[in-house]
From Swiss-Prot:
Gene3D superfamilies: P-loop containing nucleotide triphosphate hydrolases, Translation factors, Translation initiation factor IF- 2, domain 3
Organism the protein comes from: Methanospirillum hungatei JF-1 (strain ATCC 27890 / DSM 864 / NBRC 100397 / JF-1)
Full protein name: Probable translation initiation factor IF-2
Residues covered by region (G5): 210-212
Binding-site residues for GTP, renumbered to this chain: 27-34, 88-92, 142-145
Organism classification: Archaea, Methanobacteriati, Methanobacteriota, Stenosarchaea group, Methanomicrobia
Membrane-crossing residue ranges in chain numbering: none
Swiss-Prot/TrEMBL keywords: GTP-binding, Initiation factor, Nucleotide-binding, Protein biosynthesis
Length: 604
């Protein structure tokens, strides 16, 4: 692919422009995504994050000059890529959809893997997302300095540090890298350590790095720039004067500016004075750009009050937009500069906003979230746990939400979940009323997987209680033997000694013969002259049977079965079979065969 000549005057019409490649960072929780970016940008935003997990996308521009100063081996290369723009996508797999948005938005990605732990469920999910989005990626094998015996050299390229290690350490590093290679191969990816890759189009590069010491970071940046320069230059070429398109990361109040929106601009140009279309809680609106504030190079867009006022911004970049009427803009929504067809732009945004990727059910949970991405992510996580969602909306929890949740029939789904969104005062009052507090379970928080864990724990406990109550009502299979020499009374009621051959015998059940005919109703049981309610396989007990005469309905040494109603048989075979041991299952099969001779569908 030949390099295109790029003119530096961005004000000329139809001037080709190589935009900054957008890079997303994905991986398992706590494997070091944010720490890696901290090392690259020389700042720290970890401490203020909920649960130490990034909850909103951030953006960092790393200019090519900074990258070249870190990666000495690139100084003699003719680099046309202006730098790298990193999106710090949330780390936990509960944010699948938001990460997928990042993947679709990004030109390339870094998948972070703790070299000491290897692939985890979220890591595997990350590579699947990137495969689905057709986004090329590099694997950063982080925490290199935690390899036992590793001797660190601050900010050193990997190969230089690697050469200084003893044989035992180098062998351990090789083993850890090839563990990653093997896991990637299991998922259909060919990979190798970056310095051994001859064809980056066919093989994934694995770059061992340490965010703590900076080792390997120059190599990682060099591989990213090399990939973009070699394989993406044509795709990254755009017309400067095209109308800008971006995604709203966050709505923020800024002193002296009022409500502003942080935007990742991924196409075209946005200028002061442009009319833009935005998605708000009141629908698609238009407004005029009052000012543009771009982060200074090497600054994170989440760190406030460090912005440059600019007249225009060219993709790709993180930019703060100040304009009237931004306070109701929905985070995660598209923003477009209006060109020749304003209605087409507004219709396009409206369509995108209504096509939220959420599967709803006639009955299920009600969830509210602060952003579209968070809403989709929460719904996806619930769906993965086979939890239906009845209603999912962006916005605050209202009185109407509480009232609607109370009407849900299934107590397991009579739940209201709020992710990172406030509860309106009248809704708070309603949730405190005893009638609603007893009926509705409310969960809220700013870390999705914590909310999910709390819900699952509550649901499992409630389900256990409900199952226990249900089990108490279900008649379980059992088989008994009438013992010889143990007829204590012939009838009214018959009292005999029996041995439970299998299953659990409870009072109040009907007994049937092996030909299916009724033998009477078990009214009471005694074990060692003590009244009991149930007996188990191997027990020998005395039982009283109403409606039976020994020698007529049954006799000694007869085997009797517990009579199970047809509707109970269906529940036992479809829902409770795992709770039965093999002997009880055999008795159930023996019992159902009696009735399925005439009707094969009995109890099904």
């Amino acid at each position: 692919m030949g390099k295109k000549e790029v003119k530096k005057n961005k004000n000329e019409g139809d001037t080709p422009h190589i935009r900054t490649p957008i890079v997303c960072v994905l991986g398992h929780v706590d494997h070091g995504k944010t720490s890696l970016l901290d090392r690259i940008r020389g700042s720290s935003v970890v401490a203020g994050e909920a649960g130490a997990i990034t909850q909103h996308i951030g953006a960092t521009i790393v200019p090519i000059d900074s990258i070249m100063s870190m990666s000495g081996g690139m100084k003699n290369l003719n680099i046309s890529i202006p730098g790298l723009l990193f999106i710090d996508t949330p780390g936990h797999h509960a944010f699948t959809t938001l990460r997928a948005r990042g993947g679709a938005l990004a030109d390339m990605a870094i998948v972070v893997v703790d070299i000491t732990e290897g692939f985890q469920p979220q890591t595997i999910e990350a590579i699947q997302i990137l495969r689905n989005c057709k986004t090329p990626f590099v694997v950063a094998a982080t925490k290199l300095d935690r390899i036992p015996g590793w001797r660190s050299t601050e900010k050193s390229p990997f190969l230089k540090s690697f050469a200084a290690q003893n044989e035992r350490v180098t062998l351990l590093v090789e083993t850890k890298v090839y563990d990653i290679v093997a896991t990637l191969a299991e998922h259909g990816f060919s990979s190798e350590r970056f310095d051994r890759v001859s064809d980056f189009a066919r093989n994934l590069a694995i770059v061992p790095v340490s965010a703590h010491t900076g080792e390997g970071i120059p190599d990682l940046l060099m591989v990213l720039i090399g990939l973009a320069q070699r394989y993406m230059e044509e795709a990254l070429t755009l017309t400067v004067d095209g109308p800008g398109s971006g995604t709203v990361l966050e709505v923020k109040e800024e002193k002296g500016l009022g409500a502003t929106i942080d935007v990742i601009l991924f196409d075209g140009t946005i200028r002061v004075g442009d009319e833009i279309a935005i998605a708000t809680t009141e629908g698609v609106q238009t407004t005029k750009v009052r000012s543009l504030l771009q982060p200074r190079p090497m600054q994170e867009i989440l760190v406030e009050d460090r912005f440059l006022r600019v007249k225009e911004v060219v993709a790709a970049a993180g930019v703060k937009v100040s304009a009237p009427g931004l306070d109701q803009v929905i985070a995660g929504s598209p923003v477009r500069v209006i060109g020749e067809d304003p209605e087409e732009v507004k219709t396009s945004i409206a369509k995108e906003m209504t096509e939220i990727n959420v599967s709803l059910s006639p009955e299920g949970l009600i969830i509210k979230a602060d952003t579209i991405g968070a809403l989709e992510a929460l719904c996806k996580e619930l769906t993965a746990h086979e939890i239906p969602v009845m209603r999912a909306e962006v916005g605050q929890v209202s009185r109407h939400d509480v009232i609607e949740a109370e009407t849900i029939k299934d107590p397991l789904y009579r739940v209201l979940i709020a992710f990172n969104t406030p509860v309106l005062p009248d809704a708070q009052d309603l949730l405190k009323e005893p009638a609603y507090a007893e009926m509705i379970q409310f969960f809220s928080g700013n870390v999705i997987y914590h909310i999910l864990e709390d819900y699952l724990e509550w649901r499992n406990n409630l389900k256990r209680i409900m199952d226990q109550k249900r089990f108490e009502k279900i008649i379980f299979p059992a088989k008994i033997l009438v013992l010889p020499g143990c007829v204590f009374r012939q009838n009214n009621p018959a009292v005999v000694g029996v041995r439970i051959l299998s299953g659990t015998l409870r009072t109040g059940v009907n007994l049937v013969r092996r030909d299916g005919k009724k033998a009477g109703t078990l009214k009471s049981m005694q074990l060692r002259k003590e009244n009991i309610q149930e007996a188990h396989a191997g027990d020998e007990v005395a039982i009283s049977i109403e409606g039976a005469t020994v020698g007529r309905q049954f006799d000694v040494e007869d085997e009797l079965l517990v009579g199970i109603p047809e509707r109970h048989v269906k529940v036992l075979e479809t829902e409770m079979l795992s709770h039965l041991n093999e002997d009880a299952k055999e008795v159930l099969n023996e019992y159902t065969r009696l009735f399925r001779k005439e009707n094969p569908f009995w109890g099904k």
